[in-house]
């Protein structure tokens, strides 16, 4: 099947020429192209049409889960009949194992897995290996972290057909080899069960389960059914079952990996003994032998990713396999909000290296654990085929890659203009802001306010609430799905003002927002440079009455550049509208998400603690306990993000104690 855009709109404004130039560039073999598209100009729609023109499997790379979720929802609407997949980190919370040499404390890995996101990741790899060409994957930078070898993954794909001669025992053996677990009670994704001559399989990546009827050693019938109601949905002549886990491997490879691990273990233990580190030698021997026993029995162990180099058959120091290895060689990469995403990819590799070095140095892991890592930037570049960078404010890197040439998309299909920018003094800025908010509320419009610090955002939210303004503030500790919910509540009018620090910039699609207020706009720095100001002001560009107020006592270079560029674009847009007799039209965009249909279930790994709880919590109501757990969870996630592993571990233990008290 080919990519086919489904939309009630046709390309307008600058979109037709942008689509034509970018598509022609891909066909002509241009390796790098840049789309400079202003906020609200329909860059996603342009990209969708380019994909339709070139018919290439496509990876759309976003710099965070919120933006990835929004792009996924939009592309699902544009391509309802094609394979649109979502690939982000499946951890709601992740604390890696770590050793603190100063205190001698080792902290075990702890995590909270989002089962729905895990299913979507497996759906992505399964679709990519299915051979279909009409596949578009929206991914965060987590797609550059190591996953299983695509060759091994493909080897463990099970293909069956009606009337095929195959023993039931052989099929069951293949399912176990593909890491499906047999069950009799809970029929969950990644399991199979046997009922007489029938085998039922619930793939890890699918919404429905499959029932395979045998007559002797022949498959009589294959059908899909609803796992909850057992109602038959569809019958098949053929069926492909993909592995239940990305780290699947064949018995031969597993045996070879076990032998290599044993050899490296002997070498590392001997090395530790030679330099007098007997404790480290004993520790490494015990931990690795325990893991090896698990691998022999089950085919995997906790922390098996630390042995991925052996399972992948890679040499020391070579890069891990990642999602990009699953794409065909002619795939197209689209880097959204490239001025942020590219720099994020740059910083990934160095993030966990020192932590891994400690684990190896003190005998918690073999040196091969160092090769379980994200891609280095040069490795990321080497895997690219053709790239389109998309941004309203492309950075020097993208412009250099595309030889300083970019495709401009300034005229919006709706005829909407860039926001009017006003600079006002910071004296009495809050009173002035409240007056502006009241005007917008009367018109049923929304307001975004951006501050310099989280504390300022909190204090402002408290004050505005006190004077009767319905507001919320958003910050980095709010998890992905809650963030999406907050954005939807703002659009629905459940509250009128959203306050934030650095989260109200790239890619947020909020047509109801007519005013963006930037406090302390003259404080030069990362949050108030030219690109940040342009992106933040752009949040009001999707509204007919779009306006931005910069509260400042002096005119900085960044402010002046932003104002000049905005005025240039605004003049060009007005002239185009006048020449073509266009009246700007408000955007009427549906308020929905591809995620609202699937409630997400959280699964936690951990052990039960028998330590007594803090005395005061024993008298708390269920509501208060749940509130305290939520607060501690946010603090734990923050500590883990800041690599304060000891604090994160303490908070994790506190949460487990509190959860035991819930009625």
What are the language-model segments listed below?
Residues 1-599, 638:
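ASCE RecA-like P-loop NTPase motor cores
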């Amino acid at each position: 099947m080919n990519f086919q855009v489904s939309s009630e709109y046709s390309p307008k404004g600058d979109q037709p020429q942008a689509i034509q130039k970018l598509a022609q560039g891909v066909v002509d073999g241009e390796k790098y192209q840049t789309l400079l598209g202003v906020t609200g100009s329909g860059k996603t729609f342009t990209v969708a049409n380019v994909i339709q023109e070139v018919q290439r499997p496509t990876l759309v790379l976003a710099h965070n889960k919120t933006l990835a979720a929004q792009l996924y929802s939009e592309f699902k609407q544009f391509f309802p009949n094609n394979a649109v997949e979502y690939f982000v980190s499946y951890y709601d919370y992740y604390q890696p194992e770590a050793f603190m040499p100063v205190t001698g404390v080792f902290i075990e890995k702890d995590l909270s897995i989002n089962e729905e996101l895990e299913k979507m990741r497996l759906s992505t790899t399964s679709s990519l290996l299915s051979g279909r060409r009409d596949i578009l994957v929206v991914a965060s930078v987590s797609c550059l972290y190591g996953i299983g070898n695509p060759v091994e993954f493909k080897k463990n794909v099970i293909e069956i057909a009606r009337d095929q001669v195959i023993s039931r025992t052989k099929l069951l053996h293949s399912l176990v080899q593909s890491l499906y677990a047999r069950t009799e009670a809970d029929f969950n994704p990644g399991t199979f069960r046997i009922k007489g001559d029938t085998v039922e399989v619930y793939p890890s990546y699918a919404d429905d389960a499959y029932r395979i009827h045998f007559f002797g050693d022949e498959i009589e019938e294959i059908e899909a059914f609803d796992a909850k109601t057992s109602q038959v949905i569809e019958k098949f002549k053929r069926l492909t079952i993909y592995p239940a886990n990305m780290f699947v491997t064949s018995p031969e490879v597993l045996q070879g990996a076990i032998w290599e691990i044993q050899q490296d273990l002997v070498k590392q233990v001997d090395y530790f003994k030679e330099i007098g580190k007997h404790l480290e030698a004993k520790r490494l021997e015990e931990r690795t032998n325990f893991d090896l026993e698990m691998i022999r029995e089950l085919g995997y162990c906790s922390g098996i990713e630390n042995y991925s180099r052996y399972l992948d058959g890679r040499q020391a120091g070579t890069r891990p396999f990642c999602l990009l290895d699953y794409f065909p060689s002619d795939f197209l990469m689209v880097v959204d909000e490239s001025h942020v995403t590219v720099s994020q990819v740059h910083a990934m590799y160095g993030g966990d290296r020192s932590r891994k070095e400690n684990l190896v140095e003190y005998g918690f892991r073999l040196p091969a654990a160092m090769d379980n890592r994200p891609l280095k930037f040069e490795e990321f570049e080497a895997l690219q085929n053709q790239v389109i960078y998309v941004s309203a404010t492309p950075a020097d890197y993208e412009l250099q890659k595309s030889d300083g040439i970019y495709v401009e998309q300034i005229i919006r299909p709706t005829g909407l203009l860039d926001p009017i920018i006003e600079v006002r003094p910071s004296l009495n800025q809050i009173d002035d802001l409240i007056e502006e908010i009241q005007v917008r509320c009367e018109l049923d419009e929304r307001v975004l306010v951006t501050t310099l610090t989280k504390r300022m955002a909190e204090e402002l939210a408290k004050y505005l609430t006190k004077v009767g303004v319905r507001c919320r503030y958003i910050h980095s500790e709010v998890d992905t799905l809650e963030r999406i919910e907050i954005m939807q509540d703002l659009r629905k009018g459940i509250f009128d003002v959203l306050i934030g620090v650095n989260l109200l910039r790239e890619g947020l699609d909020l047509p109801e927002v007519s005013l963006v207020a930037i406090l302390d706009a003259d404080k030069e720095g990362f949050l108030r440079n030219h690109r940040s100001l342009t992106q933040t002001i752009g949040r009001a560009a999707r509204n007919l009455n779009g306006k931005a107020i910069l509260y400042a006592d002096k005119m900085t270079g960044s402010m002046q550049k932003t104002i000049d560029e905005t005025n240039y674009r605004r003049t060009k847009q007005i002239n185009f509208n006048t020449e073509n007799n266009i009246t700007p039209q408000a955007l009427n965009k549906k308020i929905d998400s591809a995620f609202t249909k699937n409630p997400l279930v959280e699964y936690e790994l951990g052990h039960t603690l028998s330590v007594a709880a803090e005395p005061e919590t024993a008298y708390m109501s269920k509501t208060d306990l749940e509130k305290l757990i939520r607060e501690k969870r946010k603090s734990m996630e923050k500590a883990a993000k800041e690599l304060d592993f000891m604090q994160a571990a303490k908070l994790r233990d506190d949460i487990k104690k509190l959860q035991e008290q819930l009625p």
